[in-house]
Amino acid sequence: MGSGLPLVLLLTLLGSSHGTGPGMTLQLKLKESFLTNSSYESSFLELLEKLCLLLHLPSGTSVTLHHARSQHHVVCNT
């Protein structure tokens, strides 16, 4: 089994455009192969967009992926 690459996915759920709603943090570990199997930038942005749909996050939800090398951000548009 390959070593895992620690990634922290922070999901900030906003109840309104003023940011007064509830918050949630989800931590995930993705395998090293995730980085080597596809284009780095587009893979993370695509992952964040799919999480919006999979978790049924409301439109306007801010989703940020923090990684040692970079940070990726998407606002859900469902």
From Swiss-Prot:
What are its GO cellular component terms?
extracellular region; Golgi apparatus; transport vesicle
Q: Provide an example Pfam family for this protein.
A: SFTA2
Keywords for this protein: Cytoplasmic vesicle, Glycoprotein, Golgi apparatus, Secreted, Signal
Q: What is its main location?
A: secreted
UniProt entry tagged with the keyword Secreted: yes
Q: How does it get modified post-translation?
A: N-glycosylated.
- The protein's recorded glycosylation sites are 37
Q: In which tissues is it expressed?
A: Predominantly expressed in lung, where it is detected in type II pneumocytes in the alveolus, and in nonciliated epithelium in bronchioli (at protein level). Also detected at lower levels in cervix, esophagus, stomach, testis and kidney.
Compartments (UniProt record):
Secreted; Cytoplasmic vesicle, Secretory vesicle; Golgi apparatus
Q: Where is the signal peptide?
A: 1-19
Q: Which domain of life is it from?
A: Eukaryota
What does the UniProt record say this protein does? Putative surfactant protein.
Protein name in UniProt: Surfactant-associated protein 2
Species: Homo sapiens (Human)
